C-alpha cells in the first residue's frame, strides 16, 4: 500500500479464534486527535487471512461477523451515517479518577489517582436513529479512557445486568426472528416464539427491561459491562470481575403520566441541561468473581452476595452541542483494553471486535464530520 507511512494503528484486540488477532488502521492525511475526519481507509489485518480492505466484503459469502451486521440492517434498515447498534445517541466528555482499591486489583494507569480524560457516548438501544426515548430498550454508556503512553481503554455498557445472547451464533437469528415479514409488516409470531423457546436465555434482558422504569435521564440509570474481565495487579495477582456504573444522582424513571406526555426526544436535551448546571457523575464498581461464578456466559448474573468494590469515579462535564463530535469514529470495542486488564474467554465478548469494525466501515462514508 503506497500510503502506508500515513497509516495509524488505532487498536489491536483478540477475537473468538485463539489464533487470530485483529488490528484497525486508519490511513489519511487529515486527523483530529488521532481520528480520521476525511477520506478514511480502513484495513482489517487478521493473522492468517492477509489484509482486507473495508468496506469491501470480507468474502463472497458473509462471515459470521458480517452476518451479525447484516441482521441488524435487516431489522432496523441501513441508516446513512448511523451506527448499526445504538444508532441514536450523543457524544460527551469528562474524566475518570481511579482509587487505591482499583490499584489493588489492576496495574492499569487508569487507577493512578490522576484525572484520565474520557470520551463518552450515551445512546438508546437499537439501530434506528429515530427510536423513541420512551422505549423499553437498553440505554448505552460507551467510554474511551485516554491513558498515558497512548493506551486506550474502551467499553460498551448497557442498562441491563445481562446481555441479550449467550453465544455469538445466536446474534443474527435473534435479530432475524424480530425482523418484519414483508407481507405483513410485522415479525412472524410463530418464528419469534420458536426462537425464544429454543433459546430462553435470550429473553432475560428483555424481561429485565420490561420491569425496569424507563430512564428519565441518561445520568439516572445504572450501566453494566455484562462480560467478565481479568484484572491483574502489580504483584501479578489476578481477579475476574464484572463492572457496574451507578449514577450519583440515583436511579430515576419516568412516571406513567410522564410517559404519556413526554416527547419521543428528550434525553439529549435533558443531559445537556443537567451537565450545564453541574457535572453528572457515576461510581465505578466491580463485582468480584468467586470460583463457582460463570465467566463465559453474559446472560447469567452473579449472586448479589459477591463482594462489590468501588474503584473510581466517572465525571461527565461536557455534552456535544449537536450531531458528530469526538466519539463518532470510535468503535467502543470492549476488548480494546490497557495493560492490567484482559478479556475473559467469553465467546460473545471476543466475537464483538470484528462486527464493530465492519459496522464502522459501512457508516464512515456518511458519518457526521
Regions found by a protein language model. Give the residues of each.
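Active-site-adjacent core segments of small-molecule enzymes
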Residues: 58-369
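Intrinsic-disorder-associated, low-complexity terminal segments enriched in Asp/Asn/His/Tyr and depleted
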Residues: 16-19
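Gram-negative bacterial Sec-dependent N-terminal signal peptides
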Residues: 38-57
